[in-house]
Each structure stands twice: as C-alpha cells, then as structure tokens.
A protein has these predicted regions:
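Histidine-anchored nucleotide/phosphate-binding helix
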Residues: 5, 9-24, 338-339
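Short beta->alpha junction loops
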Residues: 6, 55-68, 326-329, 384-385
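A short acidic (Asp/Glu
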Residues: 14-17, 37-40, 93-100, 124, ...
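A broadly used, surface-exposed interaction patch
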Residues: 25-108
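Short beta-alpha junction loops
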Residues: 30-35, 115-120, 354-363
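Short, acidic/small-residue loops that bind anionic groups at enzyme active sites
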Residues: 83-84, 103-125
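Beta-rich, aromatic/charged-enriched effector core domains that present basic-aromatic interfaces
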Residues: 114-160
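Intrinsically disordered, low-complexity Ser/Thr/Pro/Gly-rich regulatory segments
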Residues: 145-402
C-alpha cells in the first residue's frame, strides 16, 4: 500500500495515515522541498519506533500549477501499487488534482480523510461512511519530535499512578486553603534543605534557630508546627518531632519534590487531575501527561537552539494541550511564550490553557491579560482554589475542545 500525503505545515497530518496503517511507502507531495527533506528521516524514525517498516520519499510540485500537480501525481500512481490519497492536509489545488486522478483511475486509487480532533476517518471514495479509529494515541515525545524538537531531561519525572494521585490531592487540599502561605512554606523548606539540613535523602533535621531565621519578620508566617502536623496527618511526611530541633521524613521522592519546589504544586495537581479524568467508556481521556517539559528547538532560520519549558503538556489522542500554571504575579509575556511554543509544536491543532491562582494579585493588569488570552485563543482557568474539585475537573476535562 502506498500512502500519498499532501505536505502540510500541521505535520501530524503528513504522517497520520502511516502511523495508523501499515503502509509500504509514504509519499509526501508539496512545494516545500527543504522542509520535506528534513521531515523524511524524522517520519521514518517515528514509524520505525512503532515497529513498522515504511519507505518515506517526497515529490516536489508547483503548488500554483494544477497541471504540474496532476502530472506528478499521475507518475506516482503509475509507479506504485494500491495508492491511497490522504485528503487530511494540503491546499485546494492539491485536492482538485486528487479528485481528477481518482476519477481517471477509478477502482485503482482510493482516498480517505482523517479528523484528528475526534479520531475518525471518512472513506471518501466509497460510500462516505465515517468510522471511529480505535486508537490514535500520539505521545508527547512523538509530537515534539514530529515538529523538529527534542525533550531535555529536566529533573524529576512524575508517575501519575493511584498512590501519587492521592498524595497530590492531599497536597492540594492543604495548599488551597491558603496558597500564599503554602508558597511561603515551600520556599522555606527549600531554603532549609539547601542551607541548614543536618540529614540526607528524604530526611530533614534543622535547629529552632535555623527555623526562626527563615521566618517572616514581625509576622506569624513560618514553618510552624500546625503546618507540619497537617502534612503528617495526610501521610505526606512521617516521624515528625517538633521542638528545639525539628525533624521529619518525606513519604517519598515525588512528594518531597512537590513540597520543596515553589510553584510545582499547581503544575502537579493540574497534571494529576488530568490523569484521573475518564471518557464515556471509562478509559483515560488524556493518553500522555508530563510536568515541566523542557523543549529544545530552533526555527528554520536560527543557528542557536531555543529552549522553552512548558509547565504541563498533555496529549488527547493526537491533540497537544499546552498548559501554563501560575501561582503568583505574571505578565502578558507568559501568554506570548505559550502561544509561540504551542503554535510551533501543534499548529492549529494545539490547545493553549493558562491556569492561575489569586487573580487579584494582578491588579490593573488582570483585565488586559484576560483580554489578550481571549484574543490569542488561550483558555483561562482562574482561581482553581476557589472552586470545587468537581468544577475544576470539569474545566480540565474540556480543555482539548477549546
């Protein structure tokens, strides 16, 4: 079987058929010779990683010359058996050319179209029936590779299993009661671990004097006993001793990472709740989720690499969802960063979301940020600590639809 794909800037459209079907050959047709040449080894690697052997090649045409497109496609059909046009991508003239050749080679050439937003395929040359595709799961790694980037190992990688999700929800239950205080305590624990911890690994031991020096002058904030007792009661720490010397042990490395990394809690609870959401059949709605994804990429005219970190990145089938999480003051630059990375690694398929707490902290910038987010097609989830968990989950369940 030979798949003929009309090369599109939304690169998932160029390889969707080859990822789903066992094609002998994938032929890219378009006017962007350099782009197709760069894409060829990337597509071959992605297909090979799925255990398939597909030859990838490309044919260059003049996209503004219908006769040239028809002639080139005619040559492709003559030189290959069982040709199938994928009409998912491509400009109008490509589709006109395909229609001409489907009529000319009736019975020899077939065509279909994928709807990647709802995982269906339409048989365009027969009865026009639309059927669901059982599984079109693209991983985060595959999606980033597809668009010419790579993921850099950026510290701890969370596993969102049942136990960790319970821990994440326990952390959220404590933190959302007073997010500013949580952030302060997280910074305090980080400082203790870096500057005055007498123990190692998951164990923390520090003196009262050290504890006092991390406190806020003239205020009641600090790493007080009630805060630590709440962590202990939720099973997040154990063996707590509170006196002239304070000591405790974190439950595990994942919990320690969340509690001792300022800002990590919001990212983790967003990812955790995404991992727990089910579809109508009881299957996980989002097939891949990661926190703190550092992407190394360069645009086609840049020599030096560009690095961007996405707080939470999720995949719904082949749809990437880029999520920025802010638990403090931020400005509109964060929206532009989100827009740039999402467009680069998803084009029109990418979904963009910003989750932020304490909107009142933005003061005069709040309405401007809301307006810019709306103009840029960025979904806003505001003040998640002020809504029920059910409402928070409802909002997260629909982020791939915006």
């Amino acid at each position: 079987m030979t798949l003929i794909e009309f090369y599109d800037k939304a690169r998932i459209e160029n390889i969707a058929g080859a990822l789903l079907a066992r094609a002998d050959k994938l032929i890219l047709v378009g006017d962007q010779r350099k782009a197709m040449e760069r894409s060829k080894p990337v597509y071959e690697e992605l297909i090979k990683e799925r255990g398939r052997s597909t030859e990838v090649c490309y044919v260059t045409v003049n996209k503004n010359n219908l006769q040239n497109i028809i002639e080139k496609l005619d040559e492709v059909i003559d030189g290959n058996d069982e040709c199938i046009f994928d009409l998912t991508g491509g400009d109008d003239l490509f589709l006109v050319a395909a229609g001409t050749l489907i009529e000319r080679f009736a019975g020899k050439v077939m065509c279909h179209r994928f709807n990647l937003k709802n995982s269906t395929v339409t048989d365009c040359d027969a009865d026009g029936n639309t059927v669901s595709v059982e599984s079109f799961d693209v991983s985060i790694e595959e999606n980033i590779k597809l668009y010419g980037g790579r993921i850099i190992d950026n510290g701890y990688k969370f596993t969102f299993d049942d136990e960790f999700n319970r821990d994440a929800n326990n952390i959220w239950s404590i933190a959302k009661n007073d997010l500013r205080y949580w952030n302060f305590c997280s910074i305090t624990i980080k400082n203790i671990m870096e500057n005055c911890n007498k123990a190692e690994g998951l164990n923390i031991t520090y003196s009262a004097d050290a504890r006092d020096t991390t406190g806020r002058k003239g205020g009641s904030y600090g790493l007080n006993e009630s805060f630590l007792r709440s962590l202990e009661a939720s099973g997040l720490i154990h063996s707590l001793k509170y006196g002239d010397e304070v000591s405790f042990s974190f439950k595990n490395e994942a919990v320690m990472n969340v509690i001792s990394t300022p800002g990590k809690m919001l990212e983790v609870i967003v990812a955790s709740k995404l991992s727990e959401i089910k579809d109508e059949l009881g299957n996980k709605l989002y097939n891949d989720i990661r926190v703190g994804v550092m992407i190394d990429w360069s645009s086609e005219d840049e020599q030096s690499p560009t690095l961007n970190e996405i707080d939470v990145l999720a995949m719904k089938d082949a749809i990437p969802i880029f999520i920025s999480c802010k638990s403090g003051i931020f400005d509109a630059d964060e929206l532009y960063k989100l827009q740039t990375v999402a467009t680069r690694f998803g084009e029109d398929y990418a979904k963009k979301v910003i989750v932020f707490t304490s909107p009142e902290m933005l003061r005069g910038n709040l309405e401007f940020i809301r307006g810019r987010a709306d103009d840029m097609g960025i979904r806003r989830i505001e003040n998640p600590d002020g809504i029920s968990d059910a409402e928070f989950e409802r909002l997260l369940k629909s982020v791939y639809l915006n």
